[in-house]
Amino acid sequence: MKVHIIGGGNLGVSIALGIAKFSKNNQVTVTRRNIASIQYLSEYGIAVSNDNKYNIEEADVVILTIKPYQVDTVLAEILPVIKNKTIASAVSGLSLEMLQTKTNFEYPVVRIMPNIAAQFGESATCISFPEKYKDNASPIVDLFQDLGTAPVIDEKLMDAATVLGACGTAYALRYIRASMQAGIEIGFDSNTALAIAAQTVKGAAKMLLEERVHPEQLIDRVTTPQGCTIVGLNEMEHNGFSSSLIKGIKTSLKQIKG
């Protein structure tokens, strides 16, 4: 499949690298106004250009990883030269109905919400699409399954998916940073503290994904009566650990919905 990504920022580049590394038999083009910072992608067999229309007529799918305010300008530029291309949008807040309206209901459309872990084959990419475009969406679902997981969800949950899956990357990293800072305070150098904190989160996530149990069941394995784990957890909860995370996620969702 030939994939044309418009928007060579962090997300677009992550998707391109993920496809190049983990998905077979695909050709990728990435466009960006200033290509100096993405020239290195050519080392992975990825074509780069500052022209959004470069190679686009050969593409099977066009992926939009641009800002909301850029959508109208980009569509005005590319629609005259693409025919029957599937348009997959990763634009925050752009509904399928809005995208169909902007494209005069003439193109198959899919809504995707990957995250920047795509370049490591670890993205949680939520996908939604109109039922009539199921066949068009199928290869896109397969593509993003190569880059991690790709659950198909009801579009009404896409804003929530943005917060949980995309913003969630930053939330997880902030937890790791806090653990790193605590590690320094209790005696580790910064590099060692970071390595321990990051690997611990990776291990916890791997256990959860492979055993497919509720997180609390795994927590119970770590905690012992009067042990150091339970007193630490209780202290965190007394200071609003879970509630602050929940409030943060809900606040992010409110920001998206305006």
Model-derived features: positions:
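Non-catalytic terminal and connector segments of soluble metabolic enzymes
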Residues: 4-6, 23, 48-50, 55-58, ...
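Rossmann-like NAD(P)(H) cofactor-binding subdomain of soluble oxidoreductases
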Residues: 15, 35-38, 44, 50-127
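Small-residue helix-packing motif on alpha-helices
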Residues: 28, 38, 55, 71, ...
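Short pre-catalytic strand/loop immediately N-terminal to key active-site residues, enriched for Gly-Thr
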Residues: 109, 158-163, 215-219
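NAD(P)-dependent Rossmann-like dehydrogenase/reductase catalytic/cofactor-binding core
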Residues: 198-258
